[in-house]
Regions:
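An extended, acidic
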Residues: 148-263
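Small-residue (primarily alanine) positions within well-ordered alpha-helices
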Residues: 12, 16-19, 118, 219, ...
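Generic detector of well-ordered alpha-helical packing
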Residues: 50, 54, 73, 89-92, ...
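DPxDG-like acidic metal-binding loop motif
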Residues: 79-137, 156-158
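N-terminal subdomain of lithium-sensitive/metallo-dependent phosphomonoesterases centered on the IMPase/IPPase/PAP
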Residues: 1-90, 258
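Short gly/ser/thr-rich secondary-structure transition/capping motifs
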Residues: 66-73, 142-143, 227-229
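Short loop segments at secondary-structure junctions
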Residues: 110-114, 124, 133-135, 141-142, ...
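Residue-level signal for inorganic ion chemistry
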Residues: 23, 49, 60, 93, ...
């Protein structure tokens, strides 16, 4: 199977552009409503989520009709090519309905072995983080820059992010907190933007649990192209979701993984 860098990247950018156009009219709108997808807890979905995924699916229908699609809002559509586009139209809908610009559009092009292309796009700020076999770059208000993870060697110097303070189950929270006790700084509530910052060399670790494939495949594509590592908490592949450890480099990954494995 070959990767056509030019055309696949063009399609991915067109999808991200379409999602931006669909989402931004809804952001910080006073009359925006959210439905709860859970009977217990709160997992919101809005008209913006659905409009963005539909816009991306329309792009794929024009340019990649033989590829499969897996989107958070409209599920899976089988393809014939052996490739699948994995979409989260708004990762961080809780942040979206709260008006914080930490949410993003996640796009991945994947095979059964995992992502070969990833995008994390923040429409309101105007930043786009892209990873592919051709490299990793970000574009934004200040131009274009190469993405490269940093080389922090010690947990004592590391910056750690997660989205929810509880992380997941009590055991998962305990594992996260065991790492957090060793790092220099821990921050919460960043949604997918934390992974983008890791790829950009601002963050050393992101540790989460309970993820779906569409929550992590886009970030994997970006982080790995920028030189980082993304695994589960046992060191295995993370592209199917679950417990995720994203790290800037092999040393900091090994240090965090050693703690998580022991919990």
């Amino acid at each position: 199977m070959t990767f056509d860098a030019l055309t696949d990247l063009q399609v991915a950018h067109e999808m991200a552009d379409a999602a931006r156009a669909a989402i931004l009219p809804f952001f910080r709108r006073a009359d925006l409503t959210a439905e709860n997808k859970l009977t217990e807890g709160f997992d919101p979905v809005t008209a913006a989520d659905r409009a963005a995924e539909q816009a991306m699916r329309e792009v794929l229908g024009r340019h990649r009709p033989d590829d499969g699609i897996w989107g958070e809002e409209f599920g899976q559509s089988a393809g014939q090519s052996g490739r699948q586009w994995v979409l989260d139209p708004i990762d961080g809908t809780r942040g979206f309905i709260s008006g914080t610009p930490t949410w993003g559009v996640l796009i991945a092009l994947s095979t059964e072995d995992g992502p070969i292309l990833g995008i994390v796009d923040q429409p309101y700020i105007g930043e786009r983080f892209v990873g592919s076999p051709e490299g990793a770059v970000m574009t934004g208000p200040h131009g274009v820059a190469e993405l490269k993870t940093r080389d922090t060697q010690s947990l004592a110097d590391a910056v750690l992010f997660t989205t929810f303070p509880e992380v997941g189950s009590p055991d998962e929270r305990a594992g996260f907190e065991a790492v957090a006790r060793q790092v220099r700084l821990t921050r919460y509530g960043m949604d997918c933007y934390a992974y983008a910052l890791l790829a950009a060399g601002q963050v050393d670790l992101v540790i989460e649990a309970g993820l779906n494939a569409y929550d992590i495949q886009g970030p994997i594509g970006v982080i790995e192209a920028a030189g980082g590592i993304v695994t589960d908490w046992q060191g295995g592949p993370a592209h199917n979701g679950g417990r995720v450890l994203a790290a800037a480099n092999a040393d900091i990954h090994a240090a965090a993984l050693n703690i998580l494995k022991s919990k």
